[in-house]
A protein has these predicted regions:
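Small-residue-rich helix-loop
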Residues: 195-208
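Rossmann-fold dinucleotide-binding core
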Residues: 5, 10, 95-173
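Hydrophobic beta-strand scaffold residues
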Residues: 28, 48, 113-115, 156, ...
């Protein structure tokens, strides 16, 4: 499929999406307000750009991966300046439902197509090709660019009208928080009972009480080291 994928936001999620697609011979152009994020990706073949406008002008499909609504609104304000009708924007950020619907309307008014496509998974899950994507919106646009979504996820699902992707992601997040909290309480309880945290992780991980979150975050808890896969909020905390 001869297409150019534009990625706006090259943090822990967007940067890994770019790297994975590049490894699978996709043509990728990217932009991030933090220029240092672009250099290592440029070294492996990504076209480094100077602005959101430049990426939008180059891309057949845009993927936005941004930390908050303020950043997304700034990007959309530039994207709508590019005169490409029916250009598809796959919005992968985790934001409030009303924010996603607002952006959808702004893009629709400029004859652009937004797919609400939040990702279920951590940066390390993206790297390991175990993340999922919940796509919602224009089904024909989703089908057209399905090879792109399949390029960086293990599973992807079309879940209906715009906003359904975010609804599904919020349900997934609810389960993530439940399992993460339970894993943390289990670790603390085990250590108070005199058990070694590394042993707790090793023994419980493959059993009936294990979970994907225990697999990923239990390892961090056992080592008391949360840097790997910590994501944007951990990077902000470290600063």
């Amino acid at each position: 499929m001869d297409i150019t994928v534009g990625i706006i936001g090259l943090g822990p999620m967007g940067g890994n999406i770019a790297r994975i697609l590049l490894s699978k011979s996709f043509s990728v152009a990217g932009f991030d307000v933090e220029a240092e994020r672009m250099k290592p990706l440029g070294e492996v073949g990504m076209a480094m750009t100077q602005s959101t406008n430049e990426v939008a002008d180059m891309a057949d499909i845009l993927i936005t991966s941004l930390p908050n609504m303020t950043a997304l609104e700034a990007a959309i304000a530039e994207i709508v300046k590019i005169q490409k009708t029916d250009q598809v924007i796959a919005e992968t950020s985790t934001l409030a439902l009303e924010d996603k619907l607002s952006i959808h309307q702004k893009l629709k008014a400029k004859s652009k197509i937004m797919l609400d496509c939040p990702i279920s998974g951590t940066p390390s899950m993206l790297v390991g090709m175990t993340a999922s994507i919940y796509a919602s919106g224009d089904e024909e646009a989703y089908k057209k660019y399905l090879p792109v979504f399949e390029g960086f996820t293990a599973t992807n699902y079309f879940v209906g009208k715009v906003g359904n992707g975010t609804k599904m992601k919020l349900l997934a997040n609810y389960l993530v928080h439940v399992h993460t909290t339970a894993a943390a309480e289990c670790m603390v309880m085990g250590q108070k009972a005199g058990l070694d945290p590394e042993l707790i992780y090793k023994v419980l991980k493959p059993g009936a009480g294990g979970s994907k979150m225990f697999d990923i975050r239990g390892a961090m808890m056992a080592k008391s080291d949360y840097r790997e896969g910590g994501g944007t909020m951990f990077a902000i905390y470290e600063k």
